[in-house]
Amino acid sequence: MVERRQTQRLIYVLLFLGLAALVTFYRLLPLGGYGVGHGPAGADDLNVANGYAGLTSLPMPDILLCLSLAWMVRRPDLLPAPLIAGYFLLEDILLLRPPGLWALIVLTATEFLRSRRTQLRGYGFGLEYLLIIGLLLAMFLANRAVLAIVMAPQAHLGLSLMHFLGTVLAYPLVVAVSHFAFGLRKPATGEVDSLGQKY
């Protein structure tokens, strides 16, 4: 039983890494509004590097952030903290963001959810969605606040708001795909994790 659960966990970790590689590769492609290296004349490098081609283009939702939060609500044992921190740190570097800042914010948010896994198990999707919206808002505000304090350049506020709204709207879709395509669900009462411990 334990070996089967460990195998299942490994499969989901590899699935997460595969999706992360795919999404990151897509974000680095020179596609209008969705990747690095494309934008209207005069677009500043920061907006382009973060997937923002300009005010007339839609920024890409943070799919991997949605995936991390959705999986953390359902099966926190599948995403160890080093995996989350490592991926988002690499993403910071590849997308030319301040290294470590967004990774730390994401890690804090996911560990917040991990510490409340027992309570989250009883949440319906409506309550879960409200919690995630509040958490996403806190994350984006914290990121902008820290960048403002250290006087680091950051994306236009309008683009950040569009990015936030896109991520909020993408969350239910990510949850649906995780449930129907990947078979990811909240554990039943009394179900144990890969170490034989109750959730």
Range-by-range predicted roles:
Residues M1-Y199:
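Terminal, non-globular segments
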